[in-house]
């Protein structure tokens, strides 16, 4: 599920026109929407190859351009140690971006960061990795075709994910199970649309032996009559330690999960 730590502290374990902007949200809005049907994915305004990682400080508005890896960033599988398309400095915001195929290692947040209305069309190694800081925010957007994880949490702190759509994935969020330096981590999921495929998938994977806490609210799961999507998977590092809600680590109730 995760992989051994590396010196780069990496383990395997988001303005176009108003019309384009509205289309990109579909059912997943920055605030206030309740997912009811599969999200409408945005149409890119342009496509741009990226052969070396783009560093972001402050705010970068991608204008709904599709960025995809080329050259050294042409990897899109689960090979470890890939570089990201974007690397965000502490406090940076990336918004209105589509990451296409090849996706390399998506986005790295080196500190606190905000990903707003970012869409991953075909997740590479991971969609985003949170490496340092205390608070990370993912709001709006979506991800699909993740052979393993969407969001990898290696650093400390809390990741807040809201108004997000995910499909064709194995794990939406994973707290690192084998990083060389470990932390107690928190993740909050709110207003998440999940499309099942009939295969086993997990919304969150947390390390209960480290005191991790996952809070799930307003989760809508589509196309999962067999209940293959596990809301909260517990681990002792990399060893499975059960599933389901409790009063300590996996904070949700049946009323927080809607199946359609």
Language-model features and meaning:
Residues 25-40:
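C-terminal region of N-terminal signal peptides and the immediate post-cleavage residues
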Residues 39-54, 59, 64-78, 107-124, ...:
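Extracellular beta-rich repeat passengers
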Residues 60, 79-89:
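Eukaryote-specific detector of the first structured module of a protein
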Residues 91-99, 116-118:
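Parallel beta-helix/beta-solenoid
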């Amino acid at each position: 599920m995760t992989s051994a730590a590396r010196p780069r502290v990496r383990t395997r374990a988001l303005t176009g026109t108003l019309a384009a902007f509205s289309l990109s949200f579909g059912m997943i809005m920055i605030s206030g929407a309740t997912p009811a049907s599969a999200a409408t994915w945005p149409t890119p305004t342009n496509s741009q190859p990226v052969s070396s990682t783009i560093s972001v400080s402050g705010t970068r508005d991608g204008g709904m351009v599709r960025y995809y890896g080329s050259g050294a960033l042409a990897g899109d599988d689960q090979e470890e140690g890939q570089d990201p398309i974007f690397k965000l400095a502490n406090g940076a915001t990336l918004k209105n971006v589509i990451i296409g195929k090849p996706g390399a290692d998506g986005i790295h947040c080196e500190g606190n960061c905000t990903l707003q209305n970012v869409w991953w069309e075909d997740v590479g190694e991971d969609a985003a990795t949170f490496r340092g800081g205390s608070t990370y925010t993912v709001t709006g957007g979506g991800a699909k075709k993740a052979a393993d994880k969407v969001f990898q949490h290696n650093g400390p702190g809390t990741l807040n994910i809201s108004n997000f759509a995910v499909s064709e994935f194995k794990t939406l969020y994973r707290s690192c199970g084998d990083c060389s330096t470990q932390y107690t981590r928190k993740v909050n999921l709110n207003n998440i649309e999940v499309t099942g495929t009939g295969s086993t998938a997990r919304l969150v994977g947390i390390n209960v032996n480290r005191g991790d806490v996952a809070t799930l609210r307003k989760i809508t799961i589509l196309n999962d009559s067999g209940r293959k999507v596990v809301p909260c998977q517990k681990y002792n590092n990399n060893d499975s330690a059960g599933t389901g809600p409790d009063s300590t680590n996996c904070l949700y109730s049946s009323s927080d999960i809607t199946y359609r």
